[in-house]
Amino acid sequence: RYQELTVLLLLLLEGGSWGASPLRPLCRPTNATLAAESDACPVCVTFTTTICAGYCPSMVRVLPAALPPSPQLVCTYRELSFSSIRLPGCPPGVDPIFSFPVALSCSCGSCRLSHSDCGGPRAQPHLCTRPHLSLRLL
């Protein structure tokens, strides 16, 4: 019984230090700079908004492939709102409005492609391919 409690305590202590580590921030709202552009508009706009980012616990089965794979959780929106910016200089007939999600709260869950990019971290952030303008959102 004593050994079981010791092992449990060590696991809890290790888990607590891992979770608090600055190298592995857990899933939470965080500020990020994004880029918005349209093929028809001459300017790319960069802006800062709140996204969900961070690590979620995951599990890999050790048993053979007889069991279905464990679902892998991603850091995704729990609650969100949508905001919009206007891309400047768009010609008549082109919709200049770019809408994007704003994280209000985050959680670890299945990826919802309707409002999340589930591709994982990128070597480079989304960059503008056109001249760009930085906007400050209120």
Curated annotation (Swiss-Prot):
Cellular compartments annotated: Secreted
Residues with an annotated glycan are N31
The chain's disulfide connectivity reads C27-C75, C41-C90, C44-C128, C52-C106, C56-C108, C111-C118
Provide this UniProt record's keywords sorted from A to Z: Disulfide bond, Glycoprotein, Hormone, Secreted, Signal
Please classify the protein's predominant subcellular localization into one broad category.
secreted
Signal peptide range in chain numbering: 1-19
Output the Gene Ontology terms for molecular function. Answer: hormone activity
Among SMART domains, the record links this protein to: GHB
Give the InterPro entries listed for this entry.
Answer: Cystine-knot_cytokine, Glyco_hormone_CN, Gonadotropin_bsu, Gonadotropin_bsu_CS
Q: Record's Pfam families?
A: Cys_knot (PF00007)
Q: Which family does it belong to?
A: Belongs to the glycoprotein hormones subunit beta family.
Role noted for this protein = Promotes spermatogenesis and ovulation by stimulating the testes and ovaries to synthesize steroids.
> What PANTHER family has UniProt attached to this entry?
GLYCOPROTEIN HORMONE BETA CHAIN, LUTROPIN SUBUNIT BETA
Assembly = Heterodimer of a common alpha chain and a unique beta chain which confers biological specificity to thyrotropin, lutropin, follitropin and gonadotropin.
Q: What is this protein called?
A: Lutropin subunit beta
Species annotation: Osphranter rufus
